[in-house]
A protein has these predicted regions:
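An alpha-helical appendage that flanks or caps ligand/catalytic pockets
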Residues: 1-75, 87, 102-118
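Glycine-rich, proline-tolerant flexible connector loops at the mouths of alpha/beta enzymes
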Residues: 78-90
Length: 118
């Protein structure tokens, strides 16, 4: 069972929210027009409503560890949408997922799990 989560790791929560702002508000505008979200909420409130986990990698990992669905998943898919990160920012976030977030969730790279042959 694959589970998808929107995450946005950054140096801190304020940086993550600043980088998320344009993409989230563009998405929210459509959702408000369709009656799926109320108007007038703060950016942080909209991120909570959209289940966007953002902040320092340790904060993101802690939020994911508290997710009651993840223990039942066989696959975990991360996405950055509705944010529109640059290629360099997306690469940085992928590196943070692999080196800081995923290990806190119990993931190990293939290189770490391979037993050397004698």
């Amino acid at each position: 069972v694959a589970v998808s989560r929107t995450i946005y790791p950054a140096a801190d929560r304020a940086t993550a929210l600043a980088e998320l702002r344009a993409g989230v508000l563009r998405n929210v505008e459509n959702l408000v027009a369709q009656g799926q979200l109320p108007a007038g909420l703060s950016l942080e409130q909209y991120c909570r409503r959209l289940n966007i986990v953002s902040g320092h990698p340790d904060e993101v990992a802690a939020a994911l560890q508290a997710d009651r669905i993840l223990p039942h998943a066989t696959d975990l898919i991360f996405q950055f949408s509705p944010a529109l990160p640059t290629v360099d920012t997306a690469q940085r976030m992928l590196e943070q997922i692999a080196t800081q977030i995923a290990p806190q969730l119990g993931w190990r790279s293939a290189a770490e799990t391979v037993t050397p042959s004698a």
